[in-house]
Amino acid sequence: MNWREIAVTVSSVGEEAVADLFYQLGCPGVSVEDPELLQSYVESGNWDYHDFGEIALTGTSVVKGYICEDHELQPKLRQLDEGLKELLQRFPEWVLQVKGLTVQEEDWATSWKAYFKPVRIGRHFLIKPSWEEVTPLPEDIILELDPGMAFGTGTHATTSLCLETLEETVKPDMRIFDLGTGSGILAIAAAKLGAQVEAIDLDSVAVKVAQENVELNQVADRISVRQGDLGTVLQGQADLVVANIIADVILMLIPDLKRIMKEDGEFLASGIIGHRSSDVEAGLGEHGLEVLEKKEDSGWVLLRARWQRASL
């Protein structure tokens, strides 16, 4: 099967909006290549410039989406074009360049490997690609991943914020719901901290990849991975609900927290671009939640919230 890879070069503040356009098209794979992250790897001596070409020098980000080259390709391309034009009208400095090329599915599934290297997050997490060898420290918690076509290697600020907060928050035998699990990295991290996790995703590719990563990390006894939305898949209530998605989707999820989160539970919301944080905070407040903690990294925000006592 052939896929059309659309690469949109965009200022970092526009990452979320462009990624959302791809999600609206039903793209099964969306990636963000962050030049600041790649530059940090160069400066630390982990990589050399030739590992990834020009992107580290651009000072922008590249958002890539993949659209199947079938009878729906042209309508989807027109829809994407209209969406990008609308963004350009509202924020002329955001979208800088758009490129497209045809890729084979097997190429799409493996081309990103050049960008994925072992990385330490928080106090103890060591994220290791399945094809890389590392020498761990005794206290390391190894998260071994093969993300394939699913989003989530742990290197993006949104995911690293979640991992750091999980390390501070998770207690043994907690029940956790991971909404939009992607590669399964957050579910696996929580399971290795002792939690029982129910991970869901609407994308069948993500569910397949997440299940493979769960088995790779030998935590299948602590994680269930299912396809579907929280209204049809999740039963009961969790001690902790995690959503590393985008602001608009988080806002749609908030009304359901009353059903799926315990009275003394907490909600971790990440994937929020900085200028949308106030919208999410307002949405939480409108539904009886208070923000306990706000973390920021590279223009992205994580919010940790719980029920206000008066709302129970």
Swiss-Prot record:
S-adenosyl-L-methionine binds at residues 159, 180, 201, 244. GO terms for biological process: methylation. One of its GO terms (cellular component) is cytoplasm. It catalyses: L-lysyl-[protein] + 3 S-adenosyl-L-methionine = N(6),N(6),N(6)-trimethyl-L-lysyl-[protein] + 3 S-adenosyl-L-homocysteine + 3 H(+). Its main location: cytoplasm. GO terms for molecular function: protein-lysine N-methyltransferase activity. InterPro entries: Ribosomal_L11_MeTrfase_PrmA (IPR050078), Ribosomal_PrmA_MeTrfase (IPR004498), SAM-dependent_MTases_sf (IPR029063). Disulfide bonds: none annotated. Pfam families: PrmA. It is found in: Cytoplasm. Belongs to the methyltransferase superfamily. PrmA family. NCBIfam families: prmA. This is Ribosomal protein L11 methyltransferase. It comes from Desulfitobacterium hafniense (strain DSM 10664 / DCB-2). The gene is prmA.
